[in-house]
Amino acid sequence: MLAGCSSSSLLSPTRRLRSEAVAATSATVSAHFPMNTQRLDLPCSSSFSRKETPSSRPLGRSISLDNSNNNNNKPIERKTKTSGCSLKQNIKLPPLATTRGNGEGFSWNNDNNNRGKSLKRLAEEDESCLSRAKRTKCENEGGFWFEHFTGQDSSSPALPFSLTCSGDDEEKVCFVPSEVISQPLPNWVDSVITELAGIGDKDVESSLPAAVKEASGGSSTSASSESRSLSHRVPEPTNGSRNPYSHRGATEERTTGNINNNNNRNDLQRDFELVNLLTGCLDAIRSRNIAAINHFIARTGDLASPRGRTPMTRLIAYYIEALALRVARMWPHIFHIAPPREFDRTVEDESGNALRFLNQVTPIPKFIHFTANEMLLRAFEGKERVHIIDFDIKQGLQWPSFFQSLASRINPPHHVRITGIGESKLELNETGDRLHGFAEAMNLQFEFHPVVDRLEDVRLWMLHVKEGESVAVNCVMQMHKTLYDGTGAAIRDFLGLIRSTNPIALVLAEQEAEHNSEQLETRVCNSLKYYSAMFDAIHTNLATDSLMRVKVEEMLFGREIRNIVACEGSHRQERHVGFRHWRRMLEQLGFRSLGVSEREVLQSKMLLRMYGSDNEGFFNVERSDEDNGGEGGRGGGVTLRWSEQPLYTISAWTTGGN
């Protein structure tokens, strides 16, 4: 049971779930969705590549559980007409305890040499998808679901799997997924689901009964939603004449509506079952029940997929992958993971492309960059020599618009310098070259200083702070990585480094979430609610069959989920905490808030309107912690939300002496 959760938080915000609706159609779901692109490979502190194969060719490969007995390992292969890959297939048993020493850790399988399309090609292929999403996301009627891609013949039966547990004298058959009926939802799940459902999908309208008896004995309510984000409308005739086959069209429309309603009911059932399986897996890990762990991972691997039709189906795929990684590290003599060789390569370039894709279809990166830039411009008003220290500059997407704003001033600064910090020398050099080109086009005297090092290893002398410069620090989604030290020494050292530069402004952008609990159940509960909103936002803007969507979800958010769930200690870097935590810590260490100006709030709202986000259910902006605001009573930060779920907060700070 997930600690600290109210009983309604675990289903996708895109699906306005009502627990009674599920009871009306509580028959066991027999469809199995293999995890075609699922990954069980990545060490938590690294970034690895994942090449996408062409969509015309099913993804995945046959991987089996090892049935270890008398040192004679015979894998049970799952053969299908096409090569689907599920989580169940990716976990296998090691040799028996007699050969245990050779089997610990991950076994890397180098048999997959296929190279996929580049993300640049994916972007080109998805251009039509992008324009279609922007045209239709604000429509209020009609619905259309893209066909679910499984990469496997749906008629292929799921074969029973058995698990041999090392350490005992007898062989134990732990599960047969095709014959197992999932346990009922825990009592706390009802309120969790209701809370998450309130976040989003005001876009799916179901024909479920208005009042049904809840499976767990709860009260009755109505469930209504209709797909708006992926709506597909047939244009009406433009010559003013009526359709001579209107009676046929009405019949087809009713038939399509019935099919969509059935699909919606099935999706609700599957989402409920996935939540049930995820919580059951957490309980099994806590009780160290190896047989139950294997059952829950295998069953969830059948139903969840990164290419699933609903956001929750895709989201649970990444959570169960992370739990599989976790148990493989906890019990390396029992669980083995054999990922393809291509996962063992870093993919910084593809991560950058995924970030650019996200920038095209959602306002998230633009909100962070533009709001941070406005705070920096306010701090640099009237300054002649400005120096920005960016602790994670990446491709430098934030700075071209900043240069343009500086150059448009009546008295632009005489000299602009950016110190960019990163771990890739090549990427830093390329970023510096691009920024030089932008600055030259704006007639700004510009200097770029790269610092190739890890965040915790940066020292003051590396930053080249000079006299007469007005220094500002830009820290976007980096400070939470210093919270791994339970004593607080790492964050104090980092903030001490920032103070030593004597900045006129520290701009801080962080996830508005609580993902730093010591309890795994609490982290999963809080992060599931948070990333449900993120997946919902992406689902609204990209079609279900979009390869771009797969890459954005996997490379940006899937990695964060793996780190939050699978890692501990210094390897767990995604330790997100909310603005109130940062405010308390910064004030204790001598920083004070610069507040939020009205201009910054108005600009953020204007940006969201470009994405149609002034409508209810989309992105919205609000000031954070207004009661304890900074100068002039202004709020301490500005927060981007998806419906009722906070996502990111940006704030500006300065040292006490300024």
Swiss-Prot record:
Signal peptide: none
Entry comment describing in which tissues the protein is expressed: Expressed in roots and sepals.
PANTHER family: OSJNBA0084A10.13 PROTEIN-RELATED (PTHR31636)
Superkingdom of this protein's organism: Eukaryota
Positions of the UniProt region annotated as PFYRE: 471-563
Subunit structure: Interacts with SNRNP35 and CYP95.
Record keyword Zinc-finger present: no
Region (Leucine repeat II (LRII)): 430-462
Gene: SCL28
CC annotations in GO: nucleus
Region SAW, annotated ranges: 566-654
Positions of region (Disordered): 43-85, 96-115, 209-265
GO molecular function: DNA-binding transcription factor activity
GRAS domain span: 265-654
Keyword annotations from UniProtKB, A to Z: Nucleus, Transcription, Transcription regulation
InterPro entries attached to this UniProt entry: TF_GRAS (IPR005202)
Protein name: Scarecrow-like protein 28
Stated family: Belongs to the GRAS family.
Chief place where the protein resides: nucleus
Location of region: Leucine repeat I (LRI): 272-336
Chain location of the short sequence motif VHIID per the record: 386-390
GO biological process, one term: regulation of mitotic cell cycle
Start and end residues of each stretch annotated as VHIID: 355-420
Biased composition (Low complexity): 214-228
Protein's job: Probable transcription factor involved in plant development.
Localization in the cell: Nucleus
